């Protein structure tokens, strides 16, 4: 009696909302919450905004191209398989290992950033404990089923999105003088000193590298395509929504920070070379608004 062996199939449980939040949650993190202050301090509000817009345009073309490939050929092997199939085996091999190395370094960076963030609230606890705890959480989430992973990512990414929306609302109120905050110069910061473009072309290029790091994670749609429901339908929808939402979040946040905090603010300059979460532009702005507890 012969046995027929069925090849293992991935369970396609990820919908458009999961893909949206996986990409948004992967790209919105320390690049915005911590590094955005350094971009304004180094290149001024105009330079930082221009750098994010330029990188955003580049990401748009990258994402639309990836979306076409993932829609035509959804695969569980991540997007480096497209390099193997459509270019050459060595190209796909190098792309795959570079991508692995990229995220291995990023995860380590994020675990270190967790120490600095948690130290703001729990200064007496060793940072190693927080890194170990969050590493266990990351491992646990990745060990879940596809549906469980998708729902977990949706929830955690939603928290990030809500935090940014609250930040944007408070920032708009401060710019419009609905929330009166002493010492906030608003649009005068765009013409102060060397502003809006500080440091010239070299500063713009340097900040563009930080902006590129910040957008990392948008490509997650290509990684998750092999486990998405009806990829021919969900991938194009997710690609269109993800790019504009992420670009909107970054551009609006950079504009608000550059408008409300001067590029030569001593605290912002310290944030450019400090590991103290208290110097995050988000924390500084909340303190100016009188909501230090929200930081």
Place the predicted regions along the sequence by residue:
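Membrane-interface "cap" regions at the ends of multi-pass membrane proteins
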Residues: 1-37, 41-46, 59-64, 76, ...
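Juxtamembrane interface elements at the cytosolic ends of transmembrane helices
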Residues: 36, 66, 211-235
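Junctions where cytoplasmic loops transition into the N-terminal start of transmembrane alpha-helices
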Residues: 47, 156-159, 222-258
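Hydrophobic transmembrane alpha-helices that form the core helical bundles
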Residues: 38, 50-51, 59-143, 148, ...
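TM-loop-TM module centered on a large, flexible mid-protein loop between adjacent transmembrane helices
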Residues: 81, 88, 120, 238-295
